[in-house]
Amino acid sequence: MSKVSGSNGGDSKNTLYCSFCGKSQHEVRKLIAGPTVFICDECVELCMDIIREENKSSMVKSRDGVPTPQDIIKVLDEYVIGQRQAKKILSVAVHNHYKRLAHASKNGEVELAKSNIMLVGPTGCGKTYLAQTLARIIDVPFTMADATTLTEAGYVGEDVENIILKLLQSADYNVERAQRGIVYIDEVDKISRKSDNPSITRDVSGEGVQQALLKIMEGTVASVPPQGGRKHPQQEFLQVDTTNILFICGGAFAGLDKIISARGEKTSIGFGASVKSQDDRRVGEVLRELEPEDLVKFGLIPEFIGRLPVLATLEDLDEDALIQILSEPKNALIKQYQRLFEMEDVELNFHEDALREIARKAIVRKTGARGLRSIMEKILLDTMFELPTLEGVREVVISEEVVRGSARPLYIYADRQEEKANASA
């Protein structure tokens, strides 16, 4: 029962308790009664959060049971700022891929081919995060591989089959489920051919890896040991068909913008010749003109590019986009640190100009959104060190001067109305 009688006086004589978390009616705002149980407002909110998360993963489906591109992009917008064109390309490609799988068993004259995806964009612009969010929306197994650790079979390093093994592990060794998963291969620009001409010596971590990836990306039955690698050659192998696995490759491709710009320049002589100024466009703007031939010049082999028919380029993030990333998404950095401070019963607030200064610092570092956390850690380090031992602090305020390093955070105490700047120390 959730009703307790006590002998400590009238207040505790008929105290009611939540049947789920055990809190009394005095500890919560509302206690809702059922036939034999009680539930508090906090447990109701928790249940609603769980239901919302489940609804998000299942989403509103189209007639064939696949999320529509509009549904996919709507959820992507909640987590990833900007990159509208890349989101549109991704949402259509993923929708078509899983629609193809939904109709695979039906008889038809036209066989739909798989469309793997190549993401190209500056570092820290959201390539990896887009792929992770996509897998969460579709609710399929997802794994991420680093192309720089891959080598040809027989050499020290990871085999490409290890990627399929990781996918199988994320599917709890359910082969059927793994065969519908998503694989994201990061840093794919680092496996480019070391020179334009085929070399007589083996390039085991560059072109060799591209050759090894061809078959699993196109579709093959990979033999995967349950415990990985070449360590247990005697054990029985699992057979995983990669035909329906969606491969997304991503890379920063530093210097690719120069290749694109050079292709766009046409030299002419004589009186009608136009004088070209140096291309001063941002990297993201130049990348919009990307063609497969540019990736071949960069060092990817034509067969590899042919397995990635969908090309999506991402913009480099400007100041406004970085400010949005700091504060707007559901798991924004500011919200994460505010939650951390809430655990100490302290409110954390940032001035608008402080956020702008943080964004400027990230742009100077050329690390994109990835550099925001390290900047935040540096700003809040001393405060997070001192806070657990300070008493009475109600609020911490971060200004532009604090971000620049010329001032300390402002501490506002609960037991005093005056504001105290922790300037000396």
Swiss-Prot record:
Pfam hit, one: ClpB_D2-small
Q: Its GO CC terms?
A: HslUV protease complex
The protein's UniProt keywords, in alphabetical order, are: ATP-binding, Chaperone, Metal-binding, Nucleotide-binding, Zinc
Which residues does the record give as ATP binding sites? P122, T123, G124, C125, G126, K127, T128, Y129
UniProt record, GO biological process? cell division; proteolysis involved in protein catabolic process
Ranges of residues in domain ClpX-type ZB: 6-59
What is the annotated role of this protein in its UniProt record? ATP-dependent specificity component of the Clp protease. It directs the protease to specific substrates. Can perform chaperone functions in the absence of ClpP.
Q: What is this protein called?
A: ATP-dependent Clp protease ATP-binding subunit ClpX
Q: Which organism is it from?
A: Rhizobium johnstonii (strain DSM 114642 / LMG 32736 / 3841) (Rhizobium leguminosarum bv. viciae)
